Amino acid sequence: CGIYENTGQKMILTDERSKKTKLICNENYERMRGMQMEVAGFLALGILVGLLGALLGIGGGMVIVPLLVFVWHYEPQLAIGTSVLVVLLNAVSGTWGYIRQKKVCVDAALKFAVATVPGAFLGSYAAEYLQGRLFYLVFGAFFVLAAINMYRKASKNAAGKTAGVVPEVYNWKLGVLCSVGVGFLASILGIGGGIVHVPFMVYVLNFPVHVAIATSTCILAVSSLAGLVSHAMLGHIVWTSGLAIGAGAFVGAQGGVALAQRLQSGILMKLASVLVLITGIKFLMNAL
């Protein structure tokens, strides 16, 4: 009888171990599946960001930050820092495409890019103070004002600048001054800065829209690199998600570069303004 009892106990223990093993396997499978779905979502987001970023010369941060905050529930600083990483990869890809098309104004790109660096470093440290309602209020107000300005400026006259030429003489000192502020905003908000640079270059410095977009994308590559270094030092970056989104953005940016040649400048500006306005309203609603 003792033999049967021992055998029965062993069978029960074996069944329990088998159930535990299956449970662990199922948990691991679900965890892996969840990670795969998350990576797939990040890649898809990256492709969209790259497409819009290169198409409009705005880096894509205005899409990344809201989604990381509202969908993936990232802390503001982590969303901003991770966005800067994606903006860098997106801008590098877009710059490569625009340089091949010979649409980048090298002189302006070099001067303005260097000017963004000090502002980018300051912005990354200022981002430490964007907490709670202040974060949503600052983002919302900035996005709404920028959207109104962009839509108002997207007139038929602006569309005529698409086929224009780069002015031989432009106020580069004013451009440098603006670029310092752009670097600050890009780093503190994680948005790239093209949302300010493109309208400024078009309506103040009289650059053709497509040249302004291409040059702004090149400038973003430098300013976001400076911002990335300082955000990394502060521990603001989630590298796994940032690299996944960035990989998709690198691919999507090439599509944006190709599509930008076929659209009128007025359409580009209006598309950007609507997207920015929706995002700004969402942020302001969260600040209430």
Per-region residue spans from a language model:
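Hydrophobic alpha-helical transmembrane segments of multi-pass integral membrane proteins
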Residues: 151, 214-227
